[in-house]
Curated annotation (Swiss-Prot):
<feature type="transmembrane region" description="Helical">
    <location>
        <begin position="261"/>
        <end position="281"/>
    </location>
</feature>
<keyword id="KW-0378">Hydrolase</keyword>
<keyword id="KW-0961">Cell wall biogenesis/degradation</keyword>
<comment type="function">
    <text>Catalyzes the dephosphorylation of undecaprenyl diphosphate (UPP). Confers resistance to bacitracin.</text>
</comment>
<feature type="transmembrane region" description="Helical">
    <location>
        <begin position="204"/>
        <end position="224"/>
    </location>
</feature>
<keyword id="KW-1133">Transmembrane helix</keyword>
<feature type="transmembrane region" description="Helical">
    <location>
        <begin position="232"/>
        <end position="252"/>
    </location>
</feature>
<feature type="transmembrane region" description="Helical">
    <location>
        <begin position="126"/>
        <end position="146"/>
    </location>
</feature>
<dbReference type="Pfam" id="PF02673">
    <property type="entry name" value="BacA"/>
</dbReference>
<protein>
    <recommendedName>
        <fullName>Undecaprenyl-diphosphatase</fullName>
        <ecNumber>3.6.1.27</ecNumber>
    </recommendedName>
</protein>
<dbReference type="GO" id="GO:0008360">
    <property type="term" value="P:regulation of cell shape"/>
</dbReference>
<dbReference type="GO" id="GO:0046677">
    <property type="term" value="P:response to antibiotic"/>
</dbReference>
<feature type="transmembrane region" description="Helical">
    <location>
        <begin position="159"/>
        <end position="179"/>
    </location>
</feature>
<comment type="similarity">
    <text>Belongs to the UppP family.</text>
</comment>
<dbReference type="GO" id="GO:0050380">
    <property type="term" value="F:undecaprenyl-diphosphatase activity"/>
</dbReference>
<dbReference type="InterPro" id="IPR003824">
    <property type="entry name" value="UppP"/>
</dbReference>
<keyword id="KW-1003">Cell membrane</keyword>
Amino acid sequence: MDAAAELTLLEACWRTVVLGIVQGLTEFLPISSTAHLKVVPVLAGWGDPGVAVTAVIQLGSIAAVIGYFRSDLLQVCRGLARALREGDWGSPDARLGIAIAVGTLPVVVAGLLIKLFWPGYETSPLRSVASIGIVSIVMALLLALAERLGQRRKQLPSVQGLDGVVVGLAQALAIIPGVSRSGSTLTASLLFGWQRSDAARFSFLLGIPAITLAGLVELKGAFAEGSVYGPLPMLLGILSAAVVSWLAIAWLLKFLQTNSTWPFVIYRLVFGVVLLALVLANPTLG
């Protein structure tokens, strides 16, 4: 990555706004925000912004999803509070809260293990352009399989704790760049019979704790001495991610009410093939 001294404030702001737009467009669509936040800067000649910077920009996305689903979250909190008081753990709101809680555990455990035992993760081959291309193709094929085999009967009010475990394990796979958190959770949900729009809704709600924790854990690292981006550029990146994320959430929920996920399957296949072709043409891209 460029040294901090080589960037003017305007250049740093421009880069983080672009990263925020990319983050907002790709966080909630099943196409991998991590992959695009890695690939777009590399193709632009900026270098990999790193895990810390991208995790902090994700805070804009989490602000958007909390704002968008604020009424759902309030209902879940009320359902859990009522369950604690009255023992009514069978209500839809309480069950959804439990599913979100248990579904968050796998990604938290995976993140802690990587933090403790894989200090070189940020520069590992998994973050290479070639690896992201391969993973994107694999995930496209899995989403195609889910779209083909899924029965699409299950709705959000029928969610159980086991759903949280299954989809949460899929979410943990998104630590691998190119997998896509929303893509892996949507794929798992469809395979287990969820309706498309309800699967997306659960994916969004399940992602709130995971994305928030990732952003907070990396917050210190993003502003560490020697970081390319300072507070103002990072703030602009967060704001642009928030606005675009809100629009992406609203669009995807409406889109999946009447459409399939095949456009995302095709996009991910093309994206992966293009990345591999670029690496073959220019091996320095990695």
